[in-house]
Amino acid sequence: MFEQRVNSDVLTVATVNSQDQVTQKPLRDSVKQALKNYFAQLNGQDVSDLYELVLAEVEQPLLDMVMQYTRGNQTRAALMMGINRGTLRKKLKKYGMN
């Protein structure tokens, strides 16, 4: 579950521990842990498209949720994301979301 803390620019992830307590941790911590797991699975192999891989993993759900939040209003979505509407349209097309 993702939510943004009020009065903060930090996105957080809600997690449930073994005592069924809900805790919040910054999204970046989850990304860092996912990358640690990914590197552990590489077994020393090199990878050439890591930036694009990580960006796609974050960008697609971001676009999806923003478009849902704005009820498909691309102008509002672009403003919310701080990008040009043409850039938004290009990204939506890239992920087959147009």
Curated annotation (Swiss-Prot):
The organism's place on the tree of life at top rank: Bacteria
Gene3D superfamilies linked to this entry: Homeodomain-like
Ranges of the DNA-binding region feature: 74-93
InterPro entries according to UniProt: Fis_DNA-bd, Homeodomain-like_sf, HTH_Fis, Trans_regulatory_Fis
Pfam families, alphabetized: HTH_8
Gene Ontology molecular functions: DNA-binding transcription factor activity; sequence-specific DNA binding
Keyword annotations from UniProtKB, A to Z: Activator, DNA-binding, Transcription, Transcription regulation
Coiled coil: none
Disulfide bonds: none
Protein function: Activates ribosomal RNA transcription. Plays a direct role in upstream activation of rRNA promoters.
Oligomer and partners: Homodimer.
Similarity remark: Belongs to the transcriptional regulatory Fis family.
Name of the molecule in the record: DNA-binding protein Fis
Source species: Yersinia pestis
